[in-house]
A protein has these predicted regions:
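Membrane-embedded alpha-helical modules
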Residues: 129-243, 364-472
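Juxtamembrane transmembrane-helix boundary signature
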Residues: 93-115
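N-terminal, intrinsically disordered charge-dense segments
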Residues: 3, 15, 20-21
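Aromatic (phenylalanine/tyrosine) cluster motif
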Residues: 11-12, 22, 31-32
C-alpha cells in the first residue's frame, strides 16, 4: 500500500496530462466560440476585439437609452396608449430591430423608434389631422412593408432621386426645429399667447426652471463630449425635479414610484390596426411621409457614419447596404405590431463605432442592454417632460447640421428649403413642411425656366400635393 507521499506522487504524475487536456479543451472552446462569433456577427479579429465590441455596444446603448423615456412621454399626449405599454413596445421594437441588424446585416448599427417620426405620428397625424392612433399605426405598418418592397427593387432609387438635394437637407433641419419646439413647449419655456401666438413662460419656477437648468447642464456635457451625455443630462434633470415643486399642482416635478418591475403588457396597443381608410389620400400622404423620412434618415445615418468610420469599399460603397435597409424596414413592421411609431437606424450608433465597434456583436450587446432595461420601466416612466425637454431641444440642434450644405446664395434652392424648414414648426406639421417645400421648389424653378433641375417624378409629387390642398 503506498503511503500519503505515494498517493501524492501518483496524483501529480497523473495531473500533468489532465491539466494539459483541460487547457487543450479550454483553448478549443475559445477557438470555437470565436469562430461562432465571427460567423454569427461578421466579427473580424483583424479590425476589432471582442472586448472593444462589447464596450462599443454599451456605449451605443448609453447614448440612445433616452428614447425609453422620451417616446412614452411623447405618446402620453394620446388617449388609449398607456405609458407602460408604449415603454415596452419601444424596448421590444429596439430589441427586434437591433437583433436583426446584428444577426442578419451583421453591422454595428442600433435601432429604435425614431425622433421626429414619433412627433409626426402624435402631433401631426393624430392631434393635427384628427386621426386615431390606430390609423397612424396602420400607416407605419404599410410604410414598413413598402420599404421592404422598395429596397428589393430599384424604385427606392427613383424616389430618392426625385427629391431635390436642398429639400432633403431642409427636411432634416425642419424636423429638428419641430421637435425642439415641442421640447420648449413641453417644458413650459415657450407657452401659448392669444396675442402673439407664443411667448416665453416663467423660467424662474416649476418645470420651466428645471428644464432650463437641465438644458444648460446637458449642453455642457455635449460640449465636453461626455459619453452618454443626453442620458446623464436627462437623469440629472429628473433628480433635480425631485427637489422642486410645480406651482400648478403643488407636487414635485419628479416622483419616482419604484426601480424594478415586470414589463407592462403591450396587449392594449398590440396589432391595433384600422383598415377602413387605407385607400384615402390622407393615408397615402401619411405613408409617404413616414417612408420618406425613414428612408432618408436611415440612408443618411448609415452613409455618414460608415464613411466617417472607413466602413466603405474602395469605390465608396457600403457593403451590405440592402441588408441594413431591410433590417430597418423589418424593424418598422415589428414596431408597428408592438404598437409604436417607425423604428429607424440611430445616428447615436456613431458613438459605439467611434469606440471601435465594427460588427454585429456591437449591435447584439446594445440589444441585450435594451432587454435588461425592460425591467426598469418605473425609472424611465417617472422621468417628467421637464427632463426629456432638454434632450428634444439638443437632438433638434443635432438635426440642424445639414443646413450648412444648403446653398443659400442660390435662391431657387434656398427659398424652397427655407419654406420646408419653417413650415414644420409653424404649421406644427412635418408633412405640410415637406409638401410646401416640394410644391414651392417645382413652381419657383418652373417659372424660372430651370426645367432641367426638376426631376420628372417631382412634378407628379407637386401635382398630388396641390390636389390635396385644393380638394381635401
Amino acid at each position: 500500500m503506498p503511503g500519503i507521499a505515494g498517493h501524492r506522487d501518483l496524483f501529480f504524475a497523473g495531473g500533468i496530462p489532465v491539466a494539459q487536456r483541460f487547457i487543450k479543451r479550454h483553448n478549443q472552446s475559445i477557438f470555437f466560440m470565436k469562430k461562432f462569433i465571427q460567423k454569427a456577427f461578421g466579427y473580424d479579429p483583424k479590425t476589432s476585439s471582442i472586448k472593444t465590441e462589447i464596450l462599443a455596444g454599451l456605449t451605443t446603448f448609453l447614448t440612445m437609452a433616452y428614447i425609453l423615456a422620451v417616446n412614452p412621454g411623447i405618446f402620453s399626449a394620446l388617449d388609449g396608449m398607456p405609458g407602460g405599454s408604449v415603454f415596452t413596445a419601444t424596448a421590444l421594437a429596439s430589441i427586434l430591430g437591433t437583433l436583426v441588424m446584428a444577426l442578419w446585416a451583421k453591422k454595428p448599427f442600433a435601432l429604435a423608434p425614431g425622433m421626429g417620426l414619433n412627433a409626426f405620428f402624435v402631433f401631426t397625424v393624430c392631434l393635427g389631422m384628427g386621426y386615431s392612433w390606430q390609423f397612424a399605426l396602420t400607416a407605419v405598418l404599410i410604410e414598413g412593408l413598402l420599404f421592404i418592397i422598395l429596397t428589393l427593387t430599384n424604385i427606392r432609387k427613383i424616389i430618392v432621386d426625385s427629391i431635390p438635394v436642398s429639400i432633403k437637407k431642409a427636411i432634416g433641419c425642419g424636423i429638428g426645429l419641430f421637435i425642439a419646439f415641442i421640447g420648449l413647449n413641453n417644458a413650459g419655456i415657450v407657452v401659448d399667447n392669444p396675442a402673439t401666438l407664443v411667448s416665453i413662460g416663467d423660467i424662474t419656477t416649476g418645470k420651466a426652471l428645471v428644464a432650463f437648468i437641465g438644458l444648460i447642464f446637458t449642453a455642457f456635457l455635449v460640449v465636453k463630449k461626455v459619453p452618454g451625455s443626453l442620458l446623464i443630462g436627462m437623469i440629472s434633470t429628473a433628480v433635480l425635479g425631485m427637489f422642486i415643486k410645480d406651482p400648478a399642482t403643488g407636487k414635485h416635478i419628479t416622483e419616482f414610484s419604484g426601480v424594478v418591475s415586470m414589463p407592462e403588457s403591450v396587449a392594449p396597443i398590440f396589432c391595433q390596426f384600422e383598415w377602413s381608410q387605407i385607400l384615402s389620400l390622407d393615408m397615402v400622404i401619411v405613408v409617404f411621409t413616414f417612408m420618406f423620412i425613414d428612408m432618408f434618415d436611415t440612408i443618411g445615418t448609415v452613409v455618414g457614419v460608415s464613411t466617417k468610420a472607413g466602413m466603405v469599399d474602395e469605390k465608396g460603397n457600403i457593403p451590405g447596404l440592402n441588408r441594413i435597409l431591410l433590417a430597418d424596414a423589418i424593424a418598422t413592421v415589428g414596431g408597428a405590431c408592438f404598437g409604436t411609431s417607425t423604428t429607424t437606424t440611430y445616428v447615436e450608433s456613431a458613438s459605439g463605432i467611434a469606440q471601435g465597434g465594427r460588427s454585429g456583436l456591437t449591435a447584439f450587446i446594445t440589444a441585450l442592454c435594451f432587454a435588461v432595461a425592460l425591467f426598469f420601466s418605473p425609472i424611465f416612466l417617472a422621468i417628467p417632460g421637464a427632463a426629456t425637454a432638454p434632450v428634444l431641444i439638443i437632438v433638434g440642434v443635432f438635426m440642424m447640421t445639414p443646413i450648412k450644405d444648403i446653398d443659400f446664395s442660390n435662391y431657387s434652392e434656398a427659398i424652397p428649403a427655407f419654406i420646408t424648414m419653417v413650415a414644420m414648426p409653424l404649421c406644427y406639421s412635418i408633412s405640410d413642411g415637406i409638401m410646401l417645400g416640394i410644391i414651392s421648389y417645382v413652381l419657383i424653378n418652373l417659372l424660372s425656366c430651370n426645367f432641367k433641375k426638376i426631376n420628372p417624378a417631382a412634378y407628379i409629387l407637386a401635382a398630388l400635393f396641390i390636389a390635396k390642398y385644393i380638394f381635401l
